[in-house]
Amino acid sequence: MKLLHIDSSVLGPHSVSRQVSAAIVARLREVNPGAAVTYRDLGASPLAHLSGAHLAVAQGAVPAPELQDDLAAGAAVLEEFLAADTVVIGAPMYNFTIPTQLKAWIDRILVAGKTFSYSGGTVQGLAAGKRVIIAISRGGFYGPDTPMAVGEHLESYLRFVFGFIGITEPDIIAADGIKFSPEHREKAIASALSAVTALRAA
């Protein structure tokens, strides 16, 4: 099994999403001892956001020399995603949605002809065979019956993005309400880590 591990929190060792994503990877390696893991830390080494120059190259323009390294980095993350059987993502909620670093990565893997295609006026996802497991951390509570539900643009966004490319049932493990109190933070982490142990092997 080829496993791609993505972290996007900027909090380093203080990050809950990193703690849970690491536990997920450890669990998968335990039940799949031969798994080959590729790790990308978007918080420590962020990708550049797409610009007009990137889009011009996608339309056939000759890339400027100063863009070459960035284009190579974008091609590398796309190939990492395409090669992976399972993708584990640590995704904290920042201002009601995903970190900007994770958005930059998503922009590099949503590529027509690679992860989705247009056919007959409809979109066809091309990544349907992959498994995606997302470790989510949120400071508050954003469930459907809560006052903050309208502000939930993390899990809902990621479900849509991966569904768009054919991965319609990502596994979500969430640690919610981690900013309410130190006690609740520990309880939320323990609950998430318990859910990790129940993950299916493959």
Curated annotation (Swiss-Prot):
Tell me the cofactor note. Binds 1 FMN per subunit.
HAMAP family found in the cross-reference section: Azoreductase_type1
Any one Gene Ontology molecular-function term assigned to this protein's record: oxidoreductase activity, acting on NAD(P)H, quinone or similar compound as acceptor
Lineage, uppermost ranks: Bacteria, Pseudomonadati, Pseudomonadota, Alphaproteobacteria, Hyphomicrobiales
Q: Could you tell me what this protein is called?
A: FMN-dependent NADH:quinone oxidoreductase
Cofactor(s) needed: FMN
On subunit structure and binding partners, the annotation says: Homodimer.
Q: Name one Pfam family in it.
A: Flavodoxin_2
Enzymatic reactions: 2 a quinone + NADH + H(+) = 2 a 1,4-benzosemiquinone + NAD(+); N,N-dimethyl-1,4-phenylenediamine + anthranilate + 2 NAD(+) = 2-(4-dimethylaminophenyl)diazenylbenzoate + 2 NADH + 2 H(+)
What PANTHER family does the entry give? Answer: FMN-DEPENDENT NADH-AZOREDUCTASE 1 (PTHR43741), FMN-DEPENDENT NADH:QUINONE OXIDOREDUCTASE (PTHR43741:SF4)
Q: Where are the transmembrane segments?
A: none
Which InterPro entries does the record match to this protein? Flavodoxin_fold (IPR003680), Flavoprotein-like_sf (IPR029039), FMN-dep_NADH:Q_OxRdtase_AzoR1 (IPR050104), NADH:quinone_OxRdtase_FMN_depd (IPR023048)
Q: What does this protein do?
A: Quinone reductase that provides resistance to thiol-specific stress caused by electrophilic quinones. Also exhibits azoreductase activity. Catalyzes the reductive cleavage of the azo bond in aromatic azo compounds to the corresponding amines.
Keywords, comma-separated and alphabetical: Flavoprotein, FMN, NAD, Oxidoreductase
Protein family per UniProt: Belongs to the azoreductase type 1 family.
- In this chain, FMN is annotated as bound at 9, 15-17, 93-96, 137-140
Q: Does the keyword Ligase apply?
A: no
Enzyme category, top tier:
oxidoreductase
- E.C. number, please? 1.6.5.-, 1.7.1.17
